[in-house]
UniProtKB/Swiss-Prot annotation:
Assigned GO CC terms: plasma membrane
SS bond partners: C96-C188
Keywords for this protein: Cell membrane, Disulfide bond, G-protein coupled receptor, Glycoprotein, Membrane, Olfaction, Receptor, Sensory transduction, Transducer, Transmembrane, Transmembrane helix
Extracellular side, ranges: 1-23, 74-98, 160-196, 258-268
Gene from which the chain derives: OR10G4
Glycan attachment sites: N3
Cytoplasmic face residues: 45-52, 120-138, 217-236, 290-311
GO MF term set: G protein-coupled receptor activity; olfactory receptor activity
Its membrane topology: Multi-pass membrane protein
Record-given protein name: Olfactory receptor 10G4
Cell compartment(s), UniProt: Cell membrane
Its job: Odorant receptor.
Cell membrane listed as a keyword: yes
Family (UniProt): Belongs to the G-protein coupled receptor 1 family.
């Protein structure tokens, strides 16, 4: 970072809303955040204790639940603070750096993980007899590690390009968390090259992952159409539709915010709610809690807790 950086703290403008809605929004987002954390913790616990769920699909789901729990934690608590009092809008320079890094780290890792999960479902549906050998434990670990390392590299690029510039004047960020586009608008230097590199970097990651996901689901649909029973096709299509809704809730807002021409405006904070608040809450429901195997495991865990002496 530049030694010319004089700004020691930033002020977050928060989520755009009418002044009288502070208490209502605080209550809503607090409940959503608590449900998100508890839902993802439950998924992690259930998959951990039930050996029947120790499969590649649930291995990736544990990674997703872990990411979602912390992805929401990176932004939502600070957003709640901005709704409580004006002093809650302040964030130190170094805290802002950390928030931006972990936001992009977890967000891009989730992006890569969606791609891996769609590939896993493609193999499971298209090659059911060879699936176990094709998705061995070592291969699952390698794919998961690759998503985390790729996310870390992507985030490092975003953070370095954003904060190596000098910040010596305005310090009001038009957002409810620290993100690259609104922060770059405050830099005391030409940001055109930085904006272009960030645009290309995010564009390659987002569009590349989305194209691979679409190709995987097109192949899955082709495989589903070859299923002879109408009930089997219906259930498979319902599962794919649910997964696609979550993917769209994550990718479409990202495209709107990061890959559109023009500068960021205040309403982008509202759009960002979809992937910072809504998607982490939906994932436990769509990917696991609607699954019969997980429901059965949850009931078994409940019985163990309620009747610990039963065998």
């Amino acid at each position: 970072m530049s030694n010319a950086s004089l700004v020691t703290a930033f002020i977050l403008t928060g989520l755009p809303h009418a002044p009288g809605l502070d208490a209502l929004l605080f209550g809503i987002f607090l409940v959503v955040y608590v449900l998100t954390v508890l839902g993802n913790l439950l998924i992690l616990l259930v998959i951990r204790v039930d050996s029947h769920l120790h499969t590649p699909m649930y291995y990736f789901l544990t990674n997703l639940s872990f990411i979602d729990m912390w992805f929401s934690t990176v932004t939502v608590p600070k957003m709640l603070m901005t709704l409580v009092s004006p002093s809650g809008r302040a964030i130190s320079f170094h805290s802002c750096v950390a928030q931006l890094y972990f936001f992009h780290f977890l967000g891009s890792t989730e992006c890569f993980l969606y791609t891996v999960m769609s590939y896993d479902r493609y193999l499971a549906i298209s090659y059911p007899l060879r699936y176990t050998s094709m998705m061995s434990g070592s291969r699952c670990a390698l794919l998961a590690t690759g998503t985390w390392l790729s996310g870390s590299l992507h985030s490092a690029v975003q953070t370095i390009l954003t904060f190596h510039l000098p910040y010596c004047g305005p310090n009001q960020i038009q957002h409810y968390f620290c993100d690259a586009p609104p922060i770059l608008k405050l830099a005391c230097a030409d940001t055109s090259a930085n904006v272009m590199v960030i645009f290309v970097d995010i564009g390659i990651v987002a569009s590349g992952c989305f194209v691979l996901i679409v190709l995987s689901y097109v192949s899955i649909v082709c495989s589903i159409l070859r299923i002879r029973t109408s009930d089997g096709r219906r259930r498979a299509f319902q599962t794919c539709a649910s997964h696609c809704i979550v993917v769209l809730c994550f990718f479409v807002p990202c495209v709107v915010i990061y890959l559109r021409p023009g500068s960021m405006d205040a309403m982008d904070g509202v759009v960002a709610i979809f992937y910072t608040v809504l998607t982490p809450l939906l994932n436990p429901v769509v990917y696991t809690l609607r699954n019969k195997e997980v429901k059965k495991a949850v009931l078994k865990l409940r019985d163990k807790v309620a009747h610990p002496q039963r065998k």
